[in-house]
Amino acid sequence: MSYLLWLTVPSKTLILTAFLLLLAFTTIPVGSMIWWATTANEPKDLGYVEIREYEGIDLSSITAFRENSIRGPQHIDTEDYRLTVTGLVNNELEYTYDDVISNYPVFEKVVTLHCVEGWSVTILWEGILVKDLIEAAGVDPNATVVIFYAYDGYSTSVPLDYIINNNIIMAYKMNGVVLPPERGFPFQLVAESKWGYKWIKWITTIELSDNEDYLGFWERRGYPNDADFQ
């Protein structure tokens, strides 16, 4: 009679019964078994792997840069970070980090940075168009200059036409890796065809202006304001 009753028990019940018996007689704590089950397939952080070649172009390493910022690398918390678009605009805008990287088309460019110190690096930059950010604010017709301000107090400017006509991007990745703090996280201007002092890092404010005589940090110290690389 017992044998017949056993055969009629649903298979799921049999599996559950066997599992409970295993728990009853094993020396492995239940907590340990649950931990193994929930962590076995979790991803392991193996660190970043940067891209070193793109469409046949050899790329420089992220580590090839030299540190020449005015106050050293800045460490910015994305929870507190805000990017402001202000000045000669119809509507001043304030973005969070996620606003910027989630709400605008993303573009990639291989661009070489040339430093006045005599070194250069060729990097695959990934980011959003500056013109998309400022056009969302509504650019005043009188605006001719875009001034960028950084978290460390640095600033520089470029012509508005340069931003628009060259599809200049504000990068948040380089060689497929999110910008590290020393490289300008959360955002760096990719000022192609300009010397490196125009490649402002740790951007916090973008101001539209009609002040074509504005001089940034190095420009006030004698560097050419156009900064065109020849």
PLM region spans:
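A glycine-rich, hydrophobic loop/mini-helix early in the fold
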Residues: 73-121
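Extended, aromatic/histidine-rich regions of cofactor-dependent oxidoreductases associated
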Residues: 2-79, 83, 136-230
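Stable alpha-helical elements in mature extracytoplasmic
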Residues: 81, 93-96, 126-129, 133, ...
